[in-house]
């Protein structure tokens, strides 16, 4: 082991200290959250050492010292892959989590189980680190399932609320569907490559098989909330705001995209798979951007913006630019975590009010929070020289100059414009105008835990994109030459979105109330997806099951075959018996006459 590998293992090992602390008496003290926050900050500074060594030397490493188990001919070891993706992502995730932990100390200060909440957040981070650094599919699957179960526990943190329990169940069930794809892909690789090591899979799988990649796409669709398996993401807003910030910035939702980036050596030679990923991403980014336009819950708007950005990352992988998608993951983490923390500050100060229509004029009451919210929204829209610009602008330029599906490109450009629209809508309703909240609310943001945590991410939202993009290793992007109008496409589309949003907001401010249009209903009801998936299908299934059990099983077996058949037989027998009037001589005589006539006829014939 050299300095490069040992310092990274040290920084990851430091994260387990607070988990071990939970076995001691420190876990019950009020200082436990402070210890967790401090240790994560130390882990971040330690992780900078191997990252800087890697940027300087460019040497990747694989740690494979610990043999785990052998199943027939498959040898499983604890493998850590220290490449470009894991080395850049680790300090980003640690930095963002450090800020979120400090924010949580302010946001969750009155929660009786705050120490357990911090332990859960930390385990969420640890499982994501396992996923990022894994070099075999089994280890990656442990991290994959780990982020899934921790998201379930954290989304359903306020388990006394029915909505929180439903949201947690939604998250775990939709991810279960994705996990089926992951397990099928693992089984396929085991049967065909006889290995779960990533290098061996890439070397042996030269047939360009679509089946395992479809499994991985299903897994990524579930985890990264792509169209079809997306409803759990807005529902996850029922969890506490720090959970939303961590979930959407650097942990669970980017795990699906990260999985596809890990397997890009297989995807880059498979054009069918690239087209599928491109179309899935384009549909997701447009649909969720449309859904964000008419939401009134500030957290749900930001959640849909996450889903839209994840769709943009899928589009980037679809045009065969995994390094660009990874760059967008890293830059997106800073301003998305900050946007959630700003919304958490507003919600907390307005006595848990999340409706943007009941805010307004917050620039005077919460100057620092609203300034950060404005910077975060501008970074999200790709404003030049903020963090989002360095990845988003490159993605749009690369898509414009690629041989790609024109419809997918058009949908992506429209979604980029809509990003500016819903970002402007948040700012217009919450920051500008007259206050529409209660005048008796005591608003105070002068808490160092709140200010310092947002301040760090604010600096990251301004400078991180520049720093990370300076240290990108050579990748597959060609030297792009394009006309000026193509170069300015991303900026023009964003400006169009801003102008459109402001014009619509100003035009509709003094209009009389009218009945919502069908397009508004479609967007507001999330494309009727939850109603169809969560109401229509379960109620139809329940009704059919009820009919099947009561009409078929109960009536047929319980009534017609056993009890009812006996009673019917007895009833018909009694009717037959009771119909006899007792005229036995007449019956015998008629029988005898019939017999004699029959015999005479036979004899006559003979």
Swiss-Prot record:
A single cellular component GO annotation: mitochondrial inner membrane
Keywords linked to the UniProt accession: Electron transport, Membrane, Mitochondrion, Mitochondrion inner membrane, NAD, Respiratory chain, Translocase, Transmembrane, Transmembrane helix, Transport, Ubiquinone
Keyword DNA repair: no
EC number from the UniProt entry: 7.1.1.2
TM segment ranges: 3-23, 35-55, 87-107, 117-137, 140-160, 171-191, 211-233, 241-261, 273-293, 301-320, 325-347, 366-386, 402-422, 457-477, 488-508, 582-602
GO annotation (BP), single: electron transport coupled proton transport
Entry's localization field: Mitochondrion inner membrane
Membrane topology of this protein: Multi-pass membrane protein
Superkingdom of source: Eukaryota
Keyword Mitochondrion set for record: yes
Catalytic activity: a ubiquinone + NADH + 5 H(+)(in) = a ubiquinol + NAD(+) + 4 H(+)(out)
Gene Ontology molecular function: any one: NADH dehydrogenase (ubiquinone) activity
NCBIfam families, alphabetized: NDH_I_L (TIGR01974)
Biological role stated in the UniProt entry: Core subunit of the mitochondrial membrane respiratory chain NADH dehydrogenase (Complex I) which catalyzes electron transfer from NADH through the respiratory chain, using ubiquinone as an electron acceptor. Essential for the catalytic activity and assembly of complex I.
Quaternary structure and interacting proteins, as annotated: Core subunit of respiratory chain NADH dehydrogenase (Complex I) which is composed of 45 different subunits.
UniProt record similarity statement: Belongs to the complex I subunit 5 family.
Name used for this protein in its record: NADH-ubiquinone oxidoreductase chain 5
Organism of this sequence: Pseudosoriculus fumidus (Taiwanese brown-toothed shrew)
């Amino acid at each position: 082991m050299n300095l490069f590998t040992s310092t990274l293992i040290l920084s990851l090992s430091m994260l387990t200290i607070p988990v071990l602390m939970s076995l001691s008496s420190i876990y019950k003290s009020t200082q436990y959250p402070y210890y967790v926050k401090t240790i994560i900050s130390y882990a971040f500074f330690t992780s900078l050492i191997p990252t800087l060594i890697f940027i300087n030397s460019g040497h990747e490493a694989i740690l494979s010292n610990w043999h785990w188990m052998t199943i027939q001919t498959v040898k499983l070891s604890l493998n850590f892959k220290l490449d470009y993706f894991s080395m850049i992502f680790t300090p980003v995730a640690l930095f963002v989590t450090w800020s979120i932990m400090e924010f949580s100390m302010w946001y969750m200060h009155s929660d009786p189980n705050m120490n357990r909440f911090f332990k859960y957040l930390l385990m969420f981070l640890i499982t994501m680190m396992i996923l990022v650094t894994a070099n075999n599919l089994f280890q990656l699957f442990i991290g994959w399932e780990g982020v899934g179960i921790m998201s379930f526990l954290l989304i359903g943190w306020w388990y006394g609320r029915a909505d929180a329990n439903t949201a947690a169940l939604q998250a775990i069930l939709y991810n279960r569907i994705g996990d089926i794809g992951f397990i099928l892909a693992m089984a396929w690789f085991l049967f065909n490559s006889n290995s779960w090591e990533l290098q061996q899979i890439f070397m042996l799988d030269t047939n360009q098989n679509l089946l395992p990649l479809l499994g991985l796409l299903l897994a990524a669709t579930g985890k990264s909330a792509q169209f079809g398996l997306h409803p759990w993401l807005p529902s996850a807003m029922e969890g506490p705001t720090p959970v939303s910030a961590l979930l959407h910035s650097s942990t669970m939702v980017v795990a699906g995209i990260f999985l596809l980036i890990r397997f890009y050596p297989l995807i880059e030679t498979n054009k069918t798979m690239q087209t599928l990923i491109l179309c899935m991403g384009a549909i997701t980014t447009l649909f969720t951007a449309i859904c964000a336009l008419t939401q009134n819950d500030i957290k749900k708007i930001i959640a849909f913006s996450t889903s839209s950005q994840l769709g943009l990352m899928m589009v980037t992988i679809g045009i065969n630019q995994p390094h660009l998608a990874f760059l967008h993951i890293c830059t997106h983490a800073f301003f998305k975590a900050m946007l959630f923390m700003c919304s958490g500050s507003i919600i907390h100060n307005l006595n848990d009010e999340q409706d943007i229509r009941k805010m307004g004029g917050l620039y005077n009451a919460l100057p620092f929070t609203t300034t950060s919210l404005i910077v975060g929204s501008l970074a999200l829209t790709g404003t030049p020289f903020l963090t989002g610009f360095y990845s988003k602008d490159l993605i749009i330029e690369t898509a414009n100059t690629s041989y790609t599906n024109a419809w997918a490109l058009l949908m992506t450009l429209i979604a980029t414009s809509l990003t500016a629209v819903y970002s402007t809508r948040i700012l217009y309703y919450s920051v500008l105008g007259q206050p529409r909240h209660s005048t008796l609310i005591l608003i105070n943001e002068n808490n160092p835990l709140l200010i310092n945590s947002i301040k760090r991410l604010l600096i990251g939202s301004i400078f991180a994109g520049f720093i990370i993009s300076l240290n990108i290793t050579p990748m597959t992007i060609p030297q792009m030459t394009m006309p000026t109008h193509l170069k300015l496409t991303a900026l023009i589309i964003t400006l169009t979105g801003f102008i459109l949003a402001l014009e619509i907001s100003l035009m509709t401010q003094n209009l009389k109330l009218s009945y919502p249009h069908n397009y508004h209903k479609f967007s507001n009801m999330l494309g009727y997806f939850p109603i169809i998936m969560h109401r229509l299908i379960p109620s139809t299934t329940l009704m059919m099951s009820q009919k099947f059990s009561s009409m078929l099983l109960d009536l047929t077996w319980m009534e017609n075959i056993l009890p009812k058949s006996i009673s019917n037989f007895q009833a018909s027998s009694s009717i037959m018996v009771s119909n006899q009037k007792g005229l036995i001589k007449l019956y015998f005589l008629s029988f005898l006459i019939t017999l004699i006539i029959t015999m005479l006829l036979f004899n006559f014939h003979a």
